[in-house]
């Protein structure tokens, strides 16, 4: 296929798609140019079905540092493991694409997005999401798309699609919404306490823009799309399915209705073991033994899936006996740990999270050096999910994509209420340890994080609570669930997480397993989540009503002063000489950022105060009109030089010493003498002129009678 180019203007920028020139051996590939951002997307599919019991989809988002004209860090000077932002972007693309493959599809699919050039004012992640959908859609991979995604900002009451970096900085909303032509199927958002009404409007505005991009993709698919390949889907033997349902469904239904999680798991597992044992014995010598046993396992999974959904939609009974809008029992506790800077333990049913706060100087802030300009990240929220939290063994090691994603969601929810750096000059780290899990552990970590921050004396603007909403839909009727547990998440159609304060929403995240949900469902879920959020906030308030007025005794003491940017070099000195001398004299630790924020850290408040005085004197500047108690340091015929403070001298001209004529400066002043002077002028070279006579009363003018003519 020869090179073909398609263009449109989207959100004020040119969107260009090129195909047929590069990566032609992939099942589908496109180059997407949006503004000056360029992303190559290649989609490939294995020829055979995988043997696992899940769809092996892998989505990568690879940031090449050359895209921003930068060298990679590190000794090897080449890209290593994906950054946190790249990992989150890969998840962002994966989530709306995954539901668009047929049930039972098991061929391995890889979608690789490579950022080739980067423009911070033209979203490379959204170009990659567009490219991922389009590469799949024009390929022979059986993808039921297209989908698309956009970013939405909210500035001065107006919604902006795919904002520039400057617009996003001014925005009260950072929203990514994706979906099909018919409905939304993925949401990721942080917000500055916005109402449910504004959030819903933002979602709908975003979906309108998504539909524009999908229409563009459909034009391209019509022009160059390949015929879809015929692939084998995982389908069970219908006769075997009917037989197992007839003989074992009643027992499985009873097991599913056991209310306590571990007991329910044991009961369902016992039923499954009986069925599997029966068919293992019957077909042990059969030539298709592996396929039959795979079908048996899949049928049992489908039976459990169907029963959970039937109970909720028809009988309005949840697996643990709750109403559809009922939250599990709640408990909140602070000060679970000694010595640490703050801790909170939050329990919701069989989900429990411990959050631990650590405060440090800004020098400990994380340096982010990606495609965007380097910056310091002050607040970190890390989420850990050990396997013992669900009573299982498993892999232990570096955080995976899920843990990174859940940590980022909690970070977005809580950072909206943090005090400014000027109000609270600390780097802040929260670590959420999930101790038990039966669904909604990410939202439990947000609640525990609120407790830890308040217990640690961080003056947050308001407490934040989170809740996870679910959905069971048969295409015609639906039920929205409050506070979903693990089984409802696993067998349900939606996981919609909402976090916020009493004033509004601070974070949203939605993933669905069906192709999309309607505005009506979104509105109902948001309203139900608000009611639940307020109920949880009441429990948090019962544990701690407001942030403590002081930090923990173990927390570091930090103070901050602001200096002019051009004074940074004065405080640091040549080769760091000045700042090293201050540190040696006072024993403090000092961090200075490029904006002139000076953080002083010590366990001794007196040392901090002494350091502030030293720095203040170093950066002090004379000001016209101010009066100083100065010392004469040099005498010349034309006047005297006086030291105002530190290394700042001023000239008192001979005419500014007194109102009467001064014949000889040395007759009036001597070196070492202390005098009061007023600054009357500072020239463009920084030279200071001062006056003594300006502080003296002006003598009356002598009478000067007119001469007679």
UniProtKB/Swiss-Prot annotation:
Its main location: cytoplasm. Its EC number is 2.7.7.8. It catalyses: RNA(n+1) + phosphate = RNA(n) + a ribonucleoside 5'-diphosphate. One of its GO terms (cellular component) is cytosol. Gene3D superfamilies: GHMP Kinase, N-terminal domain, K Homology domain, type 1, Nucleic acid-binding proteins. Its cofactor is Mg(2+). Residues 625-693 form the S1 motif domain. The keyword Metal-binding applies. Keywords: Cytoplasm, Magnesium, Metal-binding, Nucleotidyltransferase, RNA-binding, Transferase. It is an enzyme of class 2 (transferase). It is found in: Cytoplasm. Mg(2+) binds at residues 489, 495. PROSITE patterns: KH_TYPE_1, S1. Residues 556-615 form the KH domain. One of its GO terms (biological process) is mRNA catabolic process. GO terms for molecular function: 3'-5'-RNA exonuclease activity; magnesium ion binding; polyribonucleotide nucleotidyltransferase activity; RNA binding. Involved in mRNA degradation. Catalyzes the phosphorolysis of single-stranded polyribonucleotides processively in the 3'- to 5'-direction. Belongs to the polyribonucleotide nucleotidyltransferase family. This is Polyribonucleotide nucleotidyltransferase. It comes from Streptococcus agalactiae serotype Ia (strain ATCC 27591 / A909 / CDC SS700).
